[in-house]
């Protein structure tokens, strides 16, 4: 059962204040992720401690980097159940995990960060991994290689 909205609102805002679009319905997820064009980050938010202490701060750090995905999205596990399930269907080859981060390029998951890759790590270390993935898959050089 989802937590009361007033409890999770600050956790949602910790992500959306960095330009990440929240997807709360199946229709929103399909409209955003479904076309599969360009690069998109999908952050699966969570109420857990490793989201608060690692994943959300790491996301903020990584998004301050010059190179980042064209589209930034988030769903909230345990809150927006249908939207989260639909988002996870786009990266079904990966075990459901929250928090987690999927980096999608042209409809294909090219990088995935599971919860176990977040737990016990500093936000800086997690962000460094995300930035490396951004450089590899989202840079102008990466785009030129796809053409």
Q: What is the role of each PLM region?
A:
Residues 36-48:
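Short active-site neighborhood of thiol/selenol oxidoreductases, capturing the structured segment around
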């Amino acid at each position: 059962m989802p937590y009361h909205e007033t409890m999770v609102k600050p956790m949602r805002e910790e992500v959306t204040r960095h330009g990440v679009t929240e997807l709360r319905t199946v229709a929103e997820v399909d409209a955003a992720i479904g076309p599969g064009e360009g690069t998109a980050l999908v952050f699966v938010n969570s109420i857990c401690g490793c989201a608060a202490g690692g994943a959300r701060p790491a996301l903020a750090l990584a998004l301050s980097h010059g190179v980042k995905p064209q589209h930034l999205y988030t769903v909230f596990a345990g809150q927006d159940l249908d939207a989260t399930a639909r988002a996870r269907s786009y990266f079904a080859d990966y075990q459901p995990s929250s928090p987690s981060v999927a980096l999608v390029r042209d409809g294909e998951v090219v990088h995935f960060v599971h919860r176990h890759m977040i737990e016990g790590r500093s936000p800086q270390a997690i962000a460094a991994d995300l930035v490396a993935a951004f450089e590899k898959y989202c840079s102008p050089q990466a785009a030129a290689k796809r053409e």
